[in-house]
Amino acid sequence: MDKLFNRSFRIAQELQKNIAFIIQHSLKDPRIKTIITVSEVRLSKDLSYAQVFVSFLETNSNLTVKKVLILLNRASGYIRKLLCKKMNLRIIPIIVFFHDDSFFKGNKISKLLNILTEKNNITL
């Protein structure tokens, strides 16, 4: 079977959708004041551990990112409990949240390329 359609990939996609829904609708923590996007979920081979990569729409400082990640990791047990009710899996994976700053890095590279093309009058 093709690697893109294996069971762990499908479960990771379903986890991504459900975790995003839970964060947006079920977490009522007033300390989380930013919009959180779940960009990727990576599962271990035995499906017992999930790395959840999140990005934030409004990040003022690195300190804010760390605080929100700490809050999300503290709420991971609650999120896991809600996932257990939504998904029919034998094992609900342990969830650990990480910051995904690939959008900001990509935006920075794009700006640098635009500056270079303007300087050299090159069209890409």
UniProtKB/Swiss-Prot annotation:
Keywords: Cytoplasm, Ribosome biogenesis
A GO molecular-function annotation: ribosomal small subunit binding
Cellular localisation: Cytoplasm
Chief localisation class: cytoplasm
Coiled coil: none
PROSITE patterns to which the protein is assigned, alphabetical: RBFA (PS01319)
Gene3D superfamilies documented for this protein: 3.30.300.20
HAMAP family per UniProt: RbfA
Function as written in the Swiss-Prot or TrEMBL entry: One of several proteins that assist in the late maturation steps of the functional core of the 30S ribosomal subunit. Associates with free 30S ribosomal subunits (but not with 30S subunits that are part of 70S ribosomes or polysomes). Required for efficient processing of 16S rRNA. May interact with the 5'-terminal helix region of 16S rRNA.
The protein's name in its UniProt record: Ribosome-binding factor A
UniProt source species: Buchnera aphidicola subsp. Schizaphis graminum (strain Sg)
